Each structure stands twice: as structure tokens, then as C-alpha cells.
Amino acid sequence: MRLFMKYLPALGLGILLAVLSFTSFALVASAGYMHALLGNVDNLSHTSPVYLGLAAHDAGLLLLLSGLMLFSYQLLFPRLPFDWYTAVAMQMPLGLLVLWADGVSFNLTDFYGVARALTLFSAAFGVLIIFGLLQRRGRRLAQA
């Protein structure tokens, strides 16, 4: 049990990541610039290419928040392990919450389906993607 206790701060930051991501999406959707953008599009349908921009925005926001949480974990807890278990513990709350709330959507026949799938992918694997890139960069710097 003591082995898993050292990953509790990562789980706590993962819960904070889930709260931050849902809060930021709620703010952007209700009073932000995306609301104004989507409101100004005439004949908005599932085949509108504006959904590709929305998908890029949502995925970028999720990856930015994931990177912020990983870097804050490194700064706040320098003595705790920074490994794949940490990344999984940090990813788990957001990934499970998004899968529970939105479900799995792989309808890639229109732009709306592509946007949902890309957002789901970045929410379910964002921390793991950023952590993998950090590990790869660390290995390259160690070899040089």
C-alpha cells in the first residue's frame, strides 16, 4: 500500500486537471470567443468545416492544460517519482470522466464526428502524450 501512496499527489492533480478542463470548456462555450464564432456561422451543420477549427482548439486546450499539470507536478513534488505510473494516475480522472460523459465516438464521416473523436483522443491520452514527448526529449539529451 505504501508503494501506491506516492502516486496520490498525481491523482489529485489529475482531478484538478479534470475540473480545470471542464471549467475552461464551460467558460469558452458559454461566454467565450468560440460561442461568438459558432453563433456567426450560417447554416451550421455536421458537415461544416468550422468544426475542424473547433477540434484543433479543444485538443490544443487539453494538451496545454495537460502539460501545465505535468510541469506543476514536477515543480511541486520534486522528490516523488516522475514515471509512467505518475502519468497514468494523472490521466485517469480526466480520461474516465470524459469517457463516462461523452462516450466513445468514432463517427468519422463528417467534420463534427472528427472533432468529437479528436477531442476524445486528446482528453483520454493528453497527459500520456506530453509525458512520452518529455521522456523522449530526456533520452535524446542524455545521449548527446
Show the residue positions of the predicted features.
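Membrane-interface starts of transmembrane alpha-helices
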Residues: S45, P49, G53-H57, R79-M90, ...
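Hydrophobic transmembrane helix segments
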Residues: I15-L65
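Membrane-water interface at transmembrane helix exits
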Residues: F22-M34, M69-F77, P81, F131-R139
